[in-house]
């Protein structure tokens, strides 16, 4: 396992404006802009090395006693959702905003999202079209047995654990919520691909629905105006997301908080950023001075 700095070089570009004739070569003093670290974990569960993009909040000091919430981000590659979600976390944790506590973000870089984020399907066409699918059980074992213990050992985290997933990532986050809910205590589920296996996950039994379930969990489910899912049998993304919210809201447990957020101005491609921004307002309660 090794840690490498993520370095972004901010290239200064200038043009001649109002007679200004500064020579770029003489005045340019580029410096690295450090956003976080790149870490690696060797997974026995997945039989591969996984890249972790990690944002550490301002003031993070390995030598002090402060511990931080951790936000796990699916599709967390640098060219996916890591950078803009880190921006939301940093912005919302500013001293004059304090919507979100200063947090560590762990972006799990993608290798094969269809393999990692889907459970086995009974739909023949999907098996043939996407032959690597159906191994979410291994990815969940990786998260539970390897990733979370690694983060616990190597970074200063407290007991607050959030997962963010969109599309197939939202499907996986939903599967974890229903099958292994105590892995996280905050779930941000966006445009979940509940059409997978003809919506079978909506019929999944779960202990979170029982009155005996006694762990506090906050759940945000966001969806845009997205229409028909890519299935042979007609399914509507908005309808499935609402059905999921209603299923969880019907729980007999008093320890669940469920927020359903319909964003008709957003579609499947644009919803992620605004939805996470909304989720932070709903599921984080910060005492403001």
Predicted ranges, named:
Residues 1-26:
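Bacterial Sec-dependent N-terminal signal peptides
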Residues 21-289:
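Non-catalytic cap/lid and distal C-terminal segments of serine-dependent acyl enzymes
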């Amino acid at each position: 396992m090794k840690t490498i700095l993520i370095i972004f070089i901010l290239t200064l570009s200038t043009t001649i404006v109002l007679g200004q004739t500064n020579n770029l070569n003489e005045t340019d003093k580029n410096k690295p802009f450090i956003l976080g670290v790149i870490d690696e974990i060797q997974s026995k569960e997945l039989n591969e090395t996984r890249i972790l993009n990690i944002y550490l909040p301002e003031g993070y000091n390995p030598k002090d006693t402060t511990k931080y919430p951790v936000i796990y981000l699916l599709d967390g590659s640098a060219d996916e959702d890591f950078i803009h979600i880190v921006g939301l976390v940093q912005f919302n944790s500013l001293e004059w905003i304090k919507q979100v506590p200063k947090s560590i973000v762990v972006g799990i870089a993608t290798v094969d999202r269809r393999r990692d984020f889907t459970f086995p399907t009974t739909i023949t066409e999907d098996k043939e079209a996407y032959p690597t699918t159906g191994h979410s059980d291994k990815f969940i074992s990786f998260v539970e047995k390897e990733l979370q213990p690694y983060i616990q050992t190597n970074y200063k985290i407290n007991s607050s654990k959030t997962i963010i997933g969109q599309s197939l990532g939202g499907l996986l986050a939903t599967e974890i919520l229903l099958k292994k809910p105590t892995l996280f205590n905050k779930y941000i589920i966006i445009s979940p691909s509940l059409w997978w296996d003809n919506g079978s996950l909506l019929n999944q039994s779960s202990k979170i629905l029982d009155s005996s379930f006694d762990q506090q969990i906050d759940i945000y489910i966001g969806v845009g105006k997205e229409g028909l899912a890519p299935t042979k049998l007609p399914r509507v993304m908005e309808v499935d997301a609402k059905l999921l919210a209603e299923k969880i809201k019907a729980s007999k447990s008093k320890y669940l908080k469920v927020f359903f957020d319909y964003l008709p101005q957003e579609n499947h491609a644009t919803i992620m950023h605004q939805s996470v921004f909304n989720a932070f307002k709903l599921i984080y309660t910060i005492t403001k001075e």
